[in-house]
Amino acid sequence: MGVFRFISISLAAVSAANAAQILSMPHAQTVPNSYIVMMKDDTSDDDFNHHQSWLQSTHTHNITRRATIQNAGMRHKYNFSKMKGYSGIFDEETIKDIAKDPKVMFVEPDTIISVHGKVEQSNVPSWGLARISNPQPGAGSYIYDSSAGEGITVYSVDTGVDVNHEDFEGRAIWGSNQVNDGDDRDGSGHGTHTSGTMVGKEFGIAKKAKLVAVKVLGNDGSGPTSGIVAGINWSVEHARQNGGTKKAVMNMSLGGSSSSALNRAAAQAVEQGMFLSVAAGNDNQDAQSSSPASEPSVCTVGSSAEDDSRSSFSNWGPAIDLFAPGSNIISARPGGGSQSMSGTSMAAPHVAGLAAYLMALEGISGGAVCDRLKELGTSSITDAGPGTPTNVLINNGGA
């Protein structure tokens, strides 16, 4: 069902006096010996550079002495807005040394984020586009303003995108591969499908918006949190240099265990002016236990079915901002053509696409977009789930 695993965790600090927290994630699938290190907000560039130089020396000393870990060292460096940090493969003694630096905020084990369990059906009616531009279910047309997201750039932080698919009309480009697998394509199909919903000529909402593919999950639909944080970092910097963050949308149809590092990165992207649409997850449980869905500043999206009920798989709870079509959604398939998938993975790009559409039409940006989507939506969802503060289904206001 286009679904992906969301695993709840508890965070326990194990640190020495005056040392940074080393967060424990006992219920998460972790990457062996891989960690994410976040620096405090007041860390200057000079402090950060000094820390990196110290780290290289300390880690080299520890590894030389023990020689227990292969391919060790720093992998990703993060530096945008107030957020500075890095990830890498380190031995236990080096991690303890890192935590003693007073400029370190916390150290977090690197965990696996994933998408999985796709459902493909033939001859399924494409209903999502029609539903978001009509006040009642059952309509057969998508009504929209001809501006159609022009001038807005959408970042697909996902499994990659078939940027040559005919539905993108040359408006999609390859941006970055944080998986570092040397495979700049979408071997999963997930990222191409979500991107088609956002900007495709036939399947999409913002039919004139541009799209940038940011691959953070492998062809098996999974990847480490460290790479996703790097993808967010890359997207923010790319947006700043190409039209500005206030004309940028990011879609994240992914999730996993609660992660302070991932939530912090998502929050910094929003602070920089980007709009973030995030899938709530597909475990029929409280979305508050997963990241980045639990980050308050993003727009967290639950899934609706064709009859305006909450999809049976959709997560619920206080983190939910909106609902959008997510059951049996037809969109682009790598290599050409289309396929049907279900999940909050499919709901989030409806919100991202509509956000791009409204940003072009009304000139709004950032956090104001989620509020505007709530204003335009219809109170249609039945059984929104325990503790869910909204039953609003997105709508474009009838163009």
From Swiss-Prot:
Q: Which Pfam families match?
A: Inhibitor_I9, Peptidase_S8
Reply yes or no: does the keyword Hydrolase apply.
yes
Q: Which residues are glycosylated?
A: N251
| Annotated compartments | Secreted
Residues that make up the propeptide removed upon maturation: 20-116
Q: What class of enzyme is it?
A: hydrolase
Task: Cite a GO CC annotation.
Answer: extracellular region
- Domain Inhibitor I9: residue ranges: 34-115
CDD domains xref list:
Peptidases_S8_PCSK9_ProteinaseK_like
Q: Which residue ranges does the record annotate as region Disordered?
A: 175-198, 282-312
Family designation: Belongs to the peptidase S8 family.
Task: List the protein's name.
Answer: Subtilisin-like protease 1
